[in-house]
């Protein structure tokens, strides 16, 4: 059974219908429809991945927010998803407010930072030993932990395993030093166009070619492009960048905007392990991630 280990924080996700054209003044006015779930970007990816392929063992290393862990374990329907927690019980947990646009796309409004993740680093060191893939998001990386995480990444990458990191819209809260250290020990990067623009600006780079040149360990870059689908850029190590592009899927309901990066990344991880067929995997990722715009994702419903 192939093992995927992820490093991520559980959160209470509060999804609300929100008019982004009108600045929020009073939260009460905006709570037309409120949906609370146990979330966190990395957890969502892990949960979907475990549901999609029962032959994979998926492990989430996370802080022991007892209420959220209990809620998540109670509703989990897959035996191949394991929550590995630190020993210390934590009663306070982070909350994310997510705005829901009329077209089904979601956008982060605000989120609480990680409280303390020092014990989580030690947990990750143990669980990652026999993993095929290590996955996390820049949501989980900060100025306190990036050096320790990069050290773990370097050991994993030295054994020929895959390290995938997802970009996030709050990337600019990090220093360019921390971003560079993480990318220097990463093999796969995923994110949307806006997140890549933020990253390129912070690093003073002009495009994908510059990223591959500065970070030779990066083999593949996935870019979600909204209504234009998604692209995969492959570094063939011969001063040539290969590109695979998949257009957005159009249905009678709504145009697929590849709106859910959590699902997109789960499909990419499964493809990396099972098929190695980059084009087929990208096609599936575009299709699956677009389902959130056609009525949501059943696995996050209580």
Describe these PLM feature segments:
Residues 1-59, 68-71, 254:
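Glycine-rich phosphate/adenosyl-contacting loop at the front of the ribokinase-like
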Residues 32, 57-84, 91:
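A glycine-rich beta-to-alpha transition motif near the start of alpha/beta enzyme domains, typified by
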Residues 150-153, 157-162, 168-243:
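Conserved phosphate/ATP/ADP-binding segment of small-molecule kinases
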Residues 3-5, 206-302:
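Conserved phosphate-binding/catalytic region of the ribokinase-like
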């Amino acid at each position: 059974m192939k093992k995927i280990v992820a490093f991520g924080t559980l959160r209470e996700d509060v999804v609300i219908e929100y008019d982004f054209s009108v600045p929020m003044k009073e939260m009460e006015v905006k709570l037309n429809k409120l949906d609370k779930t146990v979330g966190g970007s990395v957890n969502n990816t892990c949960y979907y991945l475990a549901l999609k392929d029962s032959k994979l063992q998926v492990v989430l290393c996370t802080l022991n927010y007892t209420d959220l862990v209990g809620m998540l374990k109670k509703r989990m329907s897959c035996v191949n998803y394991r929550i590995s927690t630190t020993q210390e019980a934590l009663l306070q947990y982070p909350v994310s407010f997510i705005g829901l646009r009329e077209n089904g796309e979601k956008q982060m409004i605000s989120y609480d930072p990680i409280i303390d993740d020092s014990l989580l680093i030690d947990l990750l060191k143990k669980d990652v030993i026999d993993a095929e893939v290590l996955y996390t998001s820049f949501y989980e990386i900060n100025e306190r932990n990036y050096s320790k995480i990069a050290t773990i990444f370097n050991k994993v990458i030295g054994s020929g395993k895959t390290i995938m990191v997802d970009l996030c819209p709050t990337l600019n809260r990090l220093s360019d030093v921390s971003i560079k250290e993480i990318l220097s020990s990463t093999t796969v990067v995923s994110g949307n166009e806006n997140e890549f623009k933020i990253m390129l600006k912070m690093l003073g780079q002009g495009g994908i070619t510059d990223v591959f040149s500065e970070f030779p360990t990066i083999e593949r870059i996935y870019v979600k492009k909204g209504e234009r689908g998604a692209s995969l850029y492959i570094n063939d190590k011969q001063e040539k960048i290969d590109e695979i592009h998949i257009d957005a899927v159009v249905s009678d309901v709504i145009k697929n905007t590849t709106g859910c990066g959590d699902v997109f990344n789960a499909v990419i991880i499964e493809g990396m392990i099972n098929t190695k067929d980059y084009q087929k995997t990208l096609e599936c990722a575009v299709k699956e991630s677009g389902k959130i715009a056609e009525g949501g994702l059943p696995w996050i419903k209580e």
